[in-house]
Amino acid sequence: MVNGRETLDLTPFAGPPGNVAAWRISDALVDYAEATAFMEARAAAIAAHQAEELVWLLEHPPVYTSGTSGKPEDLRDPRFPFIATGRGGQVTYHGPGQRVAYVMLDLKRRRPDVRAYVAALEETIIRTLDAFNVRGERREDRVGVWVKRPDKGEGHEDKIAAIGVRLKRWVTFHGIAINVEPDLSHFQAIVPCGVTDPRYGVTSLVDLGLPVTMADVDVALRQAFESVFGATRAILPETA
């Protein structure tokens, strides 16, 4: 069966001519609550036409977060802080070695279609992984991007990237998280995104045997993002 999200036309997400989002990378770990407060304020400013769109790349200190569909029982071992958020999705983990990209775009200027926007984020991840010869795939019944793991047995798949979004006045925030080289044992304390089937686990690029760095992923991610959403403009963290 063909996944319906794969057939969506992504071209309109580039927006009108001259629409360029800022591209910011933070090198130091960013506290999750501080990042959320920044996104809330930035999204409001974008909606009011007082700030430009922004893609913010960062890493968090270890933290578990729950989206609007999260269940308390999905947190098995609260070894790190647990924060309830307003994003979509369930319980997940963020930590060092995971590239988080918070995407703050005005969909009124691009395409006011949430379903297509999520598919566009999935496509961005898939194209990023393709740069490292990793085949990422969508699944209709499971959010995020997955890779097949025949080395673990028939039907086994691992999640390599998560997606969780929120919109206010058609401005997006939150975004995606790609596992580059996080401590995968930290996922054992939760039911990642509510998936309990033992055939489905979590992996990372390094876990797949790829000697990639965060900088390598950042280059591929920006190229992939621009191929889906249009041009970006690199800025220094303090100018965002």
Swiss-Prot record:
<feature type="active site" description="Acyl-thioester intermediate">
    <location>
        <position position="193"/>
    </location>
</feature>
<comment type="function">
    <text>Catalyzes the transfer of endogenously produced octanoic acid from octanoyl-acyl-carrier-protein onto the lipoyl domains of lipoate-dependent enzymes. Lipoyl-ACP can also act as a substrate although octanoyl-ACP is likely to be the physiological substrate.</text>
</comment>
<feature type="binding site">
    <location>
        <begin position="175"/>
        <end position="177"/>
    </location>
    <ligand>
        <name>substrate</name>
    </ligand>
</feature>
<keyword id="KW-0963">Cytoplasm</keyword>
<keyword id="KW-0012">Acyltransferase</keyword>
<feature type="site" description="Lowers pKa of active site Cys">
    <location>
        <position position="159"/>
    </location>
</feature>
<feature type="binding site">
    <location>
        <begin position="162"/>
        <end position="164"/>
    </location>
    <ligand>
        <name>substrate</name>
    </ligand>
</feature>
<feature type="domain" description="BPL/LPL catalytic">
    <location>
        <begin position="49"/>
        <end position="233"/>
    </location>
</feature>
<comment type="pathway">
    <text>Protein modification; protein lipoylation via endogenous pathway; protein N(6)-(lipoyl)lysine from octanoyl-[acyl-carrier-protein]: step 1/2.</text>
</comment>
<dbReference type="GO" id="GO:0033819">
    <property type="term" value="F:lipoyl(octanoyl) transferase activity"/>
</dbReference>
<dbReference type="Pfam" id="PF21948">
    <property type="entry name" value="LplA-B_cat"/>
</dbReference>
<comment type="similarity">
    <text>Belongs to the LipB family.</text>
</comment>
<dbReference type="InterPro" id="IPR045864">
    <property type="entry name" value="aa-tRNA-synth_II/BPL/LPL"/>
</dbReference>
<dbReference type="InterPro" id="IPR000544">
    <property type="entry name" value="Octanoyltransferase"/>
</dbReference>
<protein>
    <recommendedName>
        <fullName>Octanoyltransferase</fullName>
        <ecNumber>2.3.1.181</ecNumber>
    </recommendedName>
</protein>
<dbReference type="GO" id="GO:0005737">
    <property type="term" value="C:cytoplasm"/>
</dbReference>
<dbReference type="InterPro" id="IPR004143">
    <property type="entry name" value="BPL_LPL_catalytic"/>
</dbReference>
<dbReference type="InterPro" id="IPR020605">
    <property type="entry name" value="Octanoyltransferase_CS"/>
</dbReference>
<feature type="binding site">
    <location>
        <begin position="87"/>
        <end position="94"/>
    </location>
    <ligand>
        <name>substrate</name>
    </ligand>
</feature>
<keyword id="KW-0808">Transferase</keyword>
<dbReference type="GO" id="GO:0036211">
    <property type="term" value="P:protein modification process"/>
</dbReference>
